Amino acid sequence: MATGLQVPLPQLATGLLLLLSVQPWAESGKVLVVPTDGSHWLSMREALRDLHARGHQVVVLTLEVNMYIKEENFFTLTTYAISWTQDEFDRLLLGHTQSFFETEHLLMKFSRRMAIMNNMSLIIHRSCVELLHNEALIRHLHATSFDVVLTDPFHLCAAVLAKYLSIPAVFFLRNIPCDLDFKGTQCPNPSSYIPRLLTTNSDHMTFLQRVKNMLYPLALSYLCHAVSAPYASLASELFQREVSVVDLVSHASVWLFRGDFVMDYPRPIMPNMVFIGGINCANGKPLSQEFEAYINASGEHGIVVFSLGSMVSEIPEKKAMAIADALGKIPQTVLWRYTGTRPSNLANNTILVKWLPQNDLLGHPMTRAFITHAGSHGVYESICNGVPMVMMPLFGDQMDNAKRMETKGAGVTLNVLEMTSEDLENALKAVINDKSYKENIMRLSSLHKDRPVEPLDLAVFWVEFVMRHKGAPHLRPAAHDLTWYQYHSLDVIGFLLAVVLTVAFITFKCCAYGYRKCLGKKGRVKKAHKSKTH
């Protein structure tokens, strides 16, 4: 009889997987990081910190003019000059954020948004041209012999650069407009139950919603072409051959999606798609004495955390006063990240701060609710820590995120332009006092955390995997090599249809010939019979 410790097979497998995920099996490598600024950068930097800790050389390549990407001790920052200044960039960004709160006519608002987006697209494309034509920098990047390019493909310049340098790429993203993530992975994307980005549809759609789901990408096709086509033209110029946008995004060896099926709806995936939703929840830290004091002073009622994200610094006075009025009518202490003008009616229970440790505050047991713009980072921090939400989506996929969480019973959504002080007050009291919201978000939190490998470890593993194997061609589906009609088997269907029609035609002709023969023979017999009777 065997003696000793008997470890059940599932626990043993999980333990080995966890051990593999934390051991630095890859030799020290060189990682070129081309990030997208803003909130996209904030989660990527956690992966860079871990890659550096595991002995890899990390180089971040970005514009001289940016929001958050500054020198840190776990990467080397390389910047390149562009033809516009920090002041010009800041003015453009301010115009973008101010447009969130405009209440003008829909067509005027749409026109203004399109103008802002067009200006931003032109600036980003111009900076890409300046990067790729910076011969000294490109020579330096070639000479450094990087093992992998880690980038967010929200802007396509890094995809062009990775292909130009012939370096395997790992994409780190939430999503890409125009369904380029589906096209780049050749992932099935049926419109019958997979809601399109920006539609706010769920996965259970009515007939009219499915019509909207099918038509929406068609309506955006012109805008998508206008934004992405310049990068295809730039790549075609560099490679001296025709290169499409899909060719650029298909270069990625592995796609690291900042999502999972707790927040997102179930859908098909491909072998090189890895889900790392909640990666920004890693590395929680103790609160400073300042924030601990705020929480201790809140008493039994606890606190509410309020942040509309890193891009919103100023709210119109009338709207800010309506918000302040609602916050003053709840017993909780409210920590509001706000750098704009202090509302004149701000109540004693509301504390304005220029910055707050959002994830760490949400992880405190005295936090009762989270007022958020429903960006993916904030939503995941809410899920990780089990805090119900009042959501005020402003732009982009925030409307979709809010719809998902509201559908799952984890929060309440308000239209920030139309809501009144009473609406916000009622929403806060609902998510704080109605236990179902807390129960639902705790259920989502439990599902999200029940996994063998943490998202950060998973992301680092796949970056190292691509470095070790110089890509991941074995995960690339053959669908990339098919034409559109081969992918949908239209040539096979056409061939089989032609065979069926040919067989049917020959059968018909044979039957017709036989019928005529039989009919002709009967006619001759009848004539012969008549002639005999006469």
Curated annotation (Swiss-Prot):
Expression sites by tissue: Isoform 1 and isoform 2 are expressed in colon and small intestine. Neither isoform is expressed in liver, kidney or esophagus.
The protein's Enzyme Commission number: 2.4.1.17
Top-rank EC class of the record's enzyme: transferase
The reaction(s) this protein catalyses: glucuronate acceptor + UDP-alpha-D-glucuronate = acceptor beta-D-glucuronoside + UDP + H(+); zolasartan + UDP-alpha-D-glucuronate = zolarsartan-1-N-beta-D-glucuronide + UDP
Carbohydrate attachment residues: 119, 296, 348
Pfam families according to UniProt: UDPGT
GO molecular function: enzyme binding; glucuronosyltransferase activity; protein heterodimerization activity; protein homodimerization activity
Record-annotated membrane-spanning stretches: 492-508
InterPro entries cross-referenced by the UniProt entry: UDP-glycosyltransferase, UDP_glucos_trans, UDP_glycos_trans_CS
Main location: endoplasmic reticulum
GO cellular component, as recorded: endoplasmic reticulum; endoplasmic reticulum membrane
Keywords: Endoplasmic reticulum, Glycoprotein, Glycosyltransferase, Membrane, Signal, Transferase, Transmembrane, Transmembrane helix
Source organism superkingdom: Eukaryota
Signal peptide: 1-28
Localization: Endoplasmic reticulum membrane
Bilayer topology term: Single-pass membrane protein
Record-stated family: Belongs to the UDP-glycosyltransferase family.
Subunit and interaction comment: Homodimer. Homooligomer. Interacts with UGT1A1, UGT1A3, UGT1A4, UGT1A6, UGT1A7, UGT1A8, UGT1A9 and UGT1A10 to form heterodimers. Isoform 1 interacts with isoform 2/i2 suggesting that oligomerization is involved in negative regulation of transferase activity by isoform 2. Isoform 1 also interacts with respective i2 isoforms of UGT1A1, UGT1A3, UGT1A4, UGT1A6, UGT1A7, UGT1A8, UGT1A9 and UGT1A10.
Additional free-text comment from the UniProt record: UGT1A5 isoform is part of the UGT1A complex locus which displays alternative use of promoters, first exons and terminal exons. The locus is defined by 13 first exons, which are alternatively spliced to 3 other common exons and 2 alternative terminal exons 5. From the 27 possible mRNA isoforms, 9 produce functionally active polypeptides (UGT1A1, 1A3, 1A4, 1A5, 1A6, 1A7, 1A8, 1A9 and 1A10) called isoforms 1 (i1). Use of an alternative exon 5 (5b) as terminal exon is leading to 9 additional alternatively spliced products termed isoforms i2 and which lack transferase activity.
Name by which UniProt lists this protein: UDP-glucuronosyltransferase 1A5
Organism for this UniProt entry: Homo sapiens (Human)
Protein's gene: UGT1A5
